[in-house]
Amino acid sequence: MVKRALLSVSDKEGIVQLAQNLSSFNIEILSTGGTAKLLRESGIDVRDVSEVTGFPECLDGRVKTLHPAVHGGILAIRDNANHMDTLKELEITPIDLVVINLYPFKETILKSDVTLAEAIENIDIGGPTMLRAAAKNHRDVTVIIDPKDYHRVLEEIKENGDTKLDTRYQLALKVFQHTAQYDALIADYLGKQISEEKIGANTITLTYEKVQDLRYGENPHQKAGFYKEIGANKGTLVDGVQLHGKELSFNNINDANGALELLKEFQEPTVVAVKHTNPCGVASGTNIEEAWHKAYESDPLSIFGGIVAANRAVTKTMAAAMKEIFLEVIIAPNFTEEALEVFKEKKNLRLIKIEDICNGNHHSYQIKKVQGGILLQEDDHILFEQLDVVTEKEPTEEEKEDLAFAFKIVKHVKSNGIVFVKNKQTLAIGPGQTSRIWALENAVKNTTHSLKGSVLASDAFFPFRDCVDTAFGAGVKAIIQPGGSINDGVSIKACNEHGISMVFTGFRHFKH
């Protein structure tokens, strides 16, 4: 039976109604500080915890509930005669219901002007201690951390005078999940005051919050969900607002993220089309409409069923053209009212608005799940520091611009990756081959464009001269690659024979 409850919350949502109902069930209410004040002002009979402990709140409220009279009442096992005799001897009354939520540490550290001192003052000590005590003793004690659970608990107490064991177990689990996240956020925040570096730490604790359940995963037989990091979501899908269309799927989110990662490489008006996380059309232009037209023309076949991301507002002209194609998702910093009107006819097309699409921060690290653990690495944020011309012929300024453009793209192509570019427009892309020459040959074979006068980017070095010979045969005038092969000299010689310029970056960009 629930006879005594302790209520102490930072989030006051629903607490008055909860206390009113508990009082109507003749349950004694203990409370502290602001919660007790609010309940009294609402006409509810409340007993201060300091009355129970015989010790006043002190140190500006830092010490309120850390006392055996509180924790003994929570932790005592009710059918353990020794425990109950001890409570009687010490004049401690059992506490059957604990309702706590914690100081708003997460909300505090998300403020742009937060200080370390302010963050530290919002680290709750007594709250987690009581929560964990009640959760540990959930066989006898009900614990609530989430106001959404108030109604469920009240209904069970009203019906049975107590909660069900299964309910108490679920609520206890919720507490341990929450306090684990709470401590992880504190550790992460304090760690960042010393260094942003996670890699190299002996232990890593990662915490995420659910955004939504997904209908299924990569395939219909796989369960899936979408979770977000705490903070650091500027310019990401989590930061976006869906304006139109069906709910995003697992594959939509994965592909859209790939499009965003690539789009963030560019500041000038650019459109990116992605299919199965690989770019299939990328172009920049003097304005976003030109960029869209060029990106679509890059590969009108592969864009079917793809994801499109633009770094400027989508216009009516773009919308009219996009409407004629089957697209899964369109992402942009904005959509004109006229564009939204055009898209109304496409009920399933998902439109996502991400205002900070250009300025959002890249992740500082990447995680890959492997059997038995994770791989953790820095984000691949370096393109190159300088271009080292290694051939007799030097690329023109226009070719250098195209080379840099192509290298930004190939960095986001599954390895082995090859990209052909001309006038800041992809003409052919060869992704995900086990042989570099196959990637190059597939790109040449599958394009509908002439590659004459184009430039070529490779995500890693050429092991043999066959790539240079094939590129020359396709009409390539300049090549950008990391270099670093023991056969670099052979590739350089081939370029010189064909009159092709080639630059080395010194940075490889494998993507798996």
Curated annotation (Swiss-Prot):
GO terms for cellular component: cytosol. GO terms for molecular function: IMP cyclohydrolase activity; phosphoribosylaminoimidazolecarboxamide formyltransferase activity. Gene3D superfamilies: 3.40.140.20, Methylglyoxal synthase-like domain (3.40.50.1380). GO terms for biological process: 'de novo' IMP biosynthetic process. CDD domains: IMPCH. It comes from the Bacteria. Pathway: Purine metabolism; IMP biosynthesis via de novo pathway; 5-formamido-1-(5-phospho-D-ribosyl)imidazole-4-carboxamide from 5-amino-1-(5-phospho-D-ribosyl)imidazole-4-carboxamide (10-formyl THF route): step 1/1; Purine metabolism; IMP biosynthesis via de novo pathway; IMP from 5-formamido-1-(5-phospho-D-ribosyl)imidazole-4-carboxamide: step 1/1. Its EC number is 2.1.2.3, 3.5.4.10. It catalyses: (6R)-10-formyltetrahydrofolate + 5-amino-1-(5-phospho-beta-D-ribosyl)imidazole-4-carboxamide = 5-formamido-1-(5-phospho-D-ribosyl)imidazole-4-carboxamide + (6S)-5,6,7,8-tetrahydrofolate; IMP + H2O = 5-formamido-1-(5-phospho-D-ribosyl)imidazole-4-carboxamide. Residues 1-145 form the MGS-like domain. Keywords: Hydrolase, Multifunctional enzyme, Purine biosynthesis, Transferase. PANTHER family: BIFUNCTIONAL PURINE BIOSYNTHESIS PROTEIN ATIC, BIFUNCTIONAL PURINE BIOSYNTHESIS PROTEIN PURH. The IMP cyclohydrolase activity resides in the N-terminal region. Belongs to the PurH family. NCBIfam families: PRK00881.1, purH. This is Bifunctional purine biosynthesis protein PurH. It comes from Alkaliphilus oremlandii (strain OhILAs) (Clostridium oremlandii (strain OhILAs)).
